[in-house]
Amino acid sequence: MNLHEYQAKSLFKSYSLPVSKSELIFSIDDIEQATTNLKVKEYVVKAQVHAGGRGKAGGVLLTKSPEEIREFCKKWLGKNLVTYQTDAKGQPVSCILLEECTDIEKELYLGLVIDRTTRSIALIASPEGGVDIETVATNSPEKIFKVFLNSSNQIKEEDVDSLSMGLNLNNSQTSDFSLMLKNLINLFTEKDFSLIEINPL
C-alpha cells in the first residue's frame, strides 16, 4: 500500500519525527480556514499523489499569497497530475497539503528499504538531497552511503558515526540524527514498511 505525503507525515509525527506544521485542503472552501490555522509568512503547497517528480510537473508551489494558493487549488483539485513516475494519464489529485515553509540550511537524502539480496534492512543516506537519488547514484556514487541493520533491526553506533561523517554533520547534529534514526527504524519495523524515503531531509 502506498501512502500520501500527508499520511506519512502523520505517522512520522506519531513517532516523534520532526515535520512542518500543515493543513489539508480537500476543496476550495477549506483554503481560508487552512491559511488562518497556519498563520505563517510563507507556504509550500503540494498536490498529493502517489508519485515523485511533483515539483518539476508543477505540483508544488512556494508562495506567500493566499490568492496564489487558491489558484493552485483550482488548477489541481479533481485533476490529474502527470510526472515522470506516472503514466500518460497521471494520477488524480484529491487533496492539497499546505505546509509552513521551512528554512533550508542543507538538503540531505535518507531512505530505509528491504534489501532483497541480504534479506535485511538497508539504510541509505546522501548529502545530495532534494534531487532524484537515482541520478546521484549514477553520477556521484561516492556520495551514496549504505549500512545494514543487524539481525535485531538495530543500527550500530559505528554505522551512525559513519553516516554522520558522510553527511558532514557536527556533534550536535549527530546526536539528533542518531535519535531520529532510531525512531525512523521503529516506524519502519513496527508498521512493516518496505520503503521509506525522506528527500530532502
Identify the role of each PLM range.
Residues Q7, K21, E32, G55-K56, ...:
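Expand to "…catalyze enediolate/carbanion chemistry for C-C bond making/breaking, isomerization
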Residues E5-A8, F12, K39-G55, T83-I104, ...:
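ATP-grasp fold ATP-binding core
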Residues M1-K41:
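A conserved helix-loop-beta module that forms one wall/lid of the active-site cleft
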Residues T86-F145:
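Hydrophobic alpha-helical hairpins/lids featuring a short glycine-rich hinge
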Residues D159-L201:
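A long amphipathic alpha-helix within ATP-dependent nucleotide-binding catalytic cores
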Residues I25, V60-S65, V113, I124-S126:
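Short beta-strand-to-turn element immediately C-terminal to the catalytic PLP-Schiff-base lysine
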Residues A122-S175:
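ATP-dependent carboxylate/phosphate-activation module, predominantly the ATP-grasp catalytic core
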Residues V19-S22, V45-K74, Y109, D132-I133, ...:
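Glycine-rich phosphate-binding loop of ATP-grasp-fold ATP-dependent ligases
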